[in-house]
């Protein structure tokens, strides 16, 4: 789309908030159609690939293993935590993302920078290969490593185990990382964020999602105590909210036994906090918004459609 004057952005966000089950049925025929559509949706749930070995340990920790011989002698490890910024208290805004950073700043078996240094020596590039992300509802760590080196594979699983519940959260390392995260927040400021600040309240219908962006607030990032982030880690990094995904050129049986041996001792809190399911209410109508910013170099049109959650 051509940009008028090459300076002014016209960002069109059309939010089409309509799906089966959200409409108010006004006739018996509509109700029948809605029920039929819901039944069809249930039949369309994506089945689990039969090649995936899955299981759940007594502590609630879930695992998924799939053998994939290409690329040869490589394996991808993912630690998925069912926790993101949506569950942060007001004094924790930004700490789900900050906690993700701290996983690389010292664990029980890899203190300080040893984790990154070890993996780089094994040929794993920090950022390009070794990485993680935090969203509203999840935090996921990824680690691609060689699978033909038993020592590297063993340590890769140990790193996943350390991330799950053995990050050290050293006070000095926390304070060092504040500057990194604050700089990340600063770099995110600009035309895109200014426009986002305008349309997200409409997109999220002023729900909790509107004020729980993963980057957090500057006030919290500058001032939170070590105890505050440790409490967040203890509350939410727990086996009943975690899963390990292993895909690659590996022995599935051996990997399953390794996972059982390594992750069965993870502990859930004596009084686990409830993970509240937040949602975005539908308005049963189409919405339109146009926002502009002179620093945004292109024109963009977006059509967004809200669908029911897909159960896997």
Where on the chain are the PLM-derived regions?
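Bacterial N-terminal signal peptides that target proteins for export
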Residues: 1-12
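An aromatic/glycine/proline-enriched structural segment found at the starts
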Residues: 28-38, 206, 243-311
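Histidine-acidic residue clusters that define the catalytic metal-binding segment
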Residues: 35-53, 141-144, 201-242, 274-279, ...
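Short, solvent-exposed loop/turn segments at the edges of secondary structure
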Residues: 58, 72-74, 123, 134-138, ...
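Short, surface-exposed beta-strand/loop micro-motifs that present aromatic residues
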Residues: 52-54, 62-68, 230-235, 285-293
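Active-site-adjacent, His/Asp/Glu-enriched structural segments that form or flank metal-binding
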Residues: 71, 81-194, 223-241, 251-254, ...
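Bacterial N-terminal signal peptides
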Residues: 10-21
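Mature N-terminal segment immediately following signal peptide/propeptide cleavage
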Residues: 39-80
